[in-house]
Regions:
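Aromatic-rich transmembrane-lumenal/periplasmic boundary elements in polytopic membrane proteins
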Residues: 100-101, 141-154, 342-386
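Hydrophobic alpha-helical transmembrane segments in multi-pass integral membrane proteins
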Residues: 21-82, 292
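Alpha-helical transmembrane segments of multi-pass inner-membrane proteins
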Residues: 1-4, 8-9, 32-47, 77, ...
Length: 495
């Protein structure tokens, strides 16, 4: 896990030309090391249990630890194998070569990694230090890159596409998926970090991360981080002590926006910064200041609350934690309904940078499929065979065929490639972590931070497809979430 968090995001061999295969190869290497270590440990454990004649007892203990998410993950892997076995192109379905390297091999391997992490992670916070180190390094390279200092000479042979490749990650959509998980995680990581020095560096990382939002040519990061922030706001409202951290994040966002606006209006770097539509809207109308103003208001109210009589403070805390938090849930529900109606009434093939056409051809391909394909899909990573057939059928002009290799929507991707059963499993992967969190008596910040990362993945998954690095991190967070749930159950059983 340490190697995956630190080295996997940074490794590349031939600039951006082979970066997907690079990430895949390194993941295979780290996975094999992990599998070998676990296999040896299991063999030693098995020998000891046989000697002590405790095989059946240990088997019962392990079976009792199986949870709903374990079952979903196992079924998902089995469905991927079956779908590939009956697909028209087994080789590409296995490798995922045509779909950002997330094929059946990756799915099965990641499920094994999930089971290892969910059983072996002990809850030690040292893991997050390595996550911070790897992410901070990649983020620093990305910011320097966006300002026009290509010190790694990554863009040397593709100057015309400078703005759509970044850092050691690759395409800006991959970058968006990566940060959509890690920014929300570190927004809450401060709450379980005791060392003030460490808190300072987390806030410094967040300042840099917010700055990167403004200067990168992608809106997807705003979507992923924004949706995760909805959960973070609710979590903060449930305990007024957490509001200070939320306020600081709002102020940091405003500061980052101010720096970005200065560089945007006064270009002084080798290359003018890139701004997508959301960044341009925030900078032109100074809307980035709103979170900062709200943060200052929250801090002032917290200071006033500290000097108020205890009776008034208790009433104010009750209002925030029991009434305002519930009102926020209702606001989210109204927002979801509004977003659905907006998409329905404004749907066209050019919607969201031609994602409308990708979604349309993907869904029509699903509808035109056989009963088997509707239930089990055409095979993981084979979406392009469906979309290209639909494009030819509609006689639709496509300038960039590679855009249609993935559905740019996680659920739709698996609906077409793994059928209704695969999409149902994927949907359950989204829902079960919320159930795990809700049923827990101790809603620790660590668990909330991991859930925030998973929500960020769901958010970015509305507009991007599965990408190997993002997918690996998502699986790791799922495994950690299951491990926290397992430890909480064990603690409750002892009590």
């Amino acid at each position: 896990m340490v190697l995956m968090f630190t080295l996997l995001p940074m490794y590349y061999s031939d600039n951006y030309y082979n970066i997907l295969n690079d990430k895949r190869d390194v993941f295979w290497l780290f996975s094999r090391i992990l599998f070998a270590v676990i296999a040896v440990s299991l063999c030693v454990s098995l020998i000891l249990t046989i000697r002590k004649r405790e095989c059946l007892k240990n088997m019962r203990v392990q079976l009792s630890k199986i949870c709903a998410l374990d079952v979903v993950m196992l079924i998902f892997a089995i469905l991927a194998v079956i779908s590939t076995a009956y697909s028209a192109d087994i080789g590409n379905s296995l490798s995922g070569e045509n779909a950002w390297d997330v094929g059946t091999q990756m799915i099965v391997c990641s499920v094994i990694v999930y089971f290892i992490i969910s059983r072996c992670y002990s809850g030690k916070g040292d893991l997050w230090v390595y996550l911070y180190a790897g992410t901070a390094a990649v983020l620093t390279i990305g910011i320097i890159d966006r300002l026009g200092y290509d010190f790694l000479v990554m863009h040397d042979e593709i100057p015309l596409q400078y703005n759509i490749f970044i850092s050691t990650i690759g395409n800006v959509n991959f970058w968006a998926g990566y940060l959509s998980m890690l920014i929300p995680f570190f927004m809450l990581a401060v709450l379980f970090t005791k060392n003030r020095f460490a808190k300072f560096f987390i806030y410094l990382f967040l300042l840099a991360a917010y700055f990167s939002l403004f200067i990168t040519l992608t809106n997807t990061t705003y979507i992923g981080v924004g949706i995760a922030t909805l959960f973070i706001v609710w979590y903060s409202l449930c305990d007024v002590k957490r509001l200070k951290n939320l306020a600081v994040n709002g102020i940091l966002f405003a500061i980052a926006g101010g720096i970005a606006e200065f560089l945007w209006r006064n270009p002084c770097t080798p290359r003018p910064i890139d701004t997508d539509s959301v960044s341009r809207l925030l900078l032109e109308h100074h809307l980035y200041l709103l979170p900062g103003i709200l943060g200052i208001v929250i801090l002032v109210l917290l200071l006033l609350g500290a000097v108020c009589p205890e009776k008034i403070r208790t009433k104010a805390d009750y209002f925030v934690e029991h009434m305002l938090s519930k009102f926020w849930i209702w606001l989210i529900m109204v927002g979801i309904i509004g977003a659905v109606f907006y998409i329905i009434y404004n749907y066209n093939l050019e919607l969201f940078n031609f994602r409308g056409s990708i979604w349309y051809f993907s869904f029509m391909g699903f509808c035109d499929g056989t009963l088997w394909q509707k239930l089990m899909g055409v095979g993981p990573a084979l979406l392009d065979t469906v979309t290209q057939a639909q494009i030819a059928k509609a006689d639709f002009f496509v300038e960039w065929n590679w855009l249609y290799c993935t559905a740019h929507n996680d659920l739709l991707e698996y609906l077409v490639t793994m059928g209704v059963f695969g999409a149902a499993c994927k949907f359950l992967m989204y829902i079960v972590p919320f159930v795990m969190y809700a049923r827990g008596k101790e809603r620790k910040p660590e668990k909330a931070a991991v859930l925030a990362a998973l929500v960020g993945y769901i958010g970015q998954g509305l507009f991007t497809g599965p990408y190997i690095l993002t997918y690996v991190f998502y699986i790791i967070f799922l495994g950690v979430m299951c491990a926290y749930d397992r430890m909480e159950k064990a603690k409750g059983a002892k009590a």
